[in-house]
Amino acid sequence: MKTEELYSGKAKTIYKTENPNELISEFRDSLTAFDGKKKSEATNKGYYNAQISKKIFEMLEEEGIKTHYLGMVSGNEMLVKKVDIILIEVIPRNIAAGSITRKYPVEEGTVFKEPVLVFDYKSDEFGDPMINDDIAVVMGIATREEIDFIRSMALKINAILKSYLESNGFLLPDFKLEFGRVDGEIVLADEISCDTCRFWDVETGESMDKDLFRFDKGDLSKAYEKVARRLVPEIFEE
C-alpha cells in the first residue's frame, strides 16, 4: 500500500498510498524538543504513541468526533484520510503547566475553573506564535464559522479525553490538537499521544510524557510503556 514518502516531520513520516485520498502515517522513535534543538531516540516510542493514538481516535469516534483515522497498517503505521491541514494548533489547558506558567502570572499545578483554549499559528518559521480569531481570518487560515466549529470540537474532545484519562489514573493538564478539511468537513487529525499531551499520574503527580525528555526528568521509554499498559493493555497480551 505504501508508495513514496510525502513528508518527514519531527516524529512521523507520511507516505502516499495507491489511494490518492489515503496516507500512511509512520510513528518513529525520534525525539525532538525546543524547536528541534534537542534530539534523541527512544525505544518503542513510535509503537506506543501509535497504539495510544489508535485507542483514543477509536474512542472519540464512538463519541461522535470525526477523525482522519482509518485503521492500522502495522504496529506503528496508521492509515489516515488525506486532509487539508488547518494551520492552527489548538491547546486545551486544564491545569497550568509549561509555557503558560512562563508567560503569565500563574503557578504550575493551578487548576483552571474552566478549560483555557489557546490557538497557535502552526509555523516553524515563525515559532508557532499565539493567534486570535481575527488574525486567523485575516490571514485566510480559517473562516469565523470554522474557528467556532473547531473551538466547539476542541472543548468536547477535552471533556471526553479528560474523563477517560482520569478513569485510567491520569490528569490531563494540557494537550495539542490539529484539524483538517476533507470532503467538506472538518475532522480531527495528527495524533493524540504522549508526545502531544501532558499526562500526570493522579496519585504521584509524575510526568508520563515528553517533559521527561525536555527537562531530563526520567526514562521516557518506561513512562510511555506505563501509559500504554493502562490505556491499551491488550497490546501486551499478544
Curated annotation (Swiss-Prot):
Transmembrane segments: none annotated. PROSITE patterns: SAICAR_SYNTHETASE_2. It catalyses: 5-amino-1-(5-phospho-D-ribosyl)imidazole-4-carboxylate + L-aspartate + ATP = (2S)-2-[5-amino-1-(5-phospho-beta-D-ribosyl)imidazole-4-carboxamido]succinate + ADP + phosphate + 2 H(+). The keyword DNA-binding does not apply. GO terms for molecular function: ATP binding; phosphoribosylaminoimidazolesuccinocarboxamide synthase activity. The keyword Transmembrane does not apply. Keywords: ATP-binding, Ligase, Nucleotide-binding, Purine biosynthesis. GO terms for biological process: 'de novo' IMP biosynthetic process; cobalamin biosynthetic process. PANTHER family: MULTIFUNCTIONAL PROTEIN ADE2, SI:DKEY-6E2.2. This is Phosphoribosylaminoimidazole-succinocarboxamide synthase. The gene is purC.
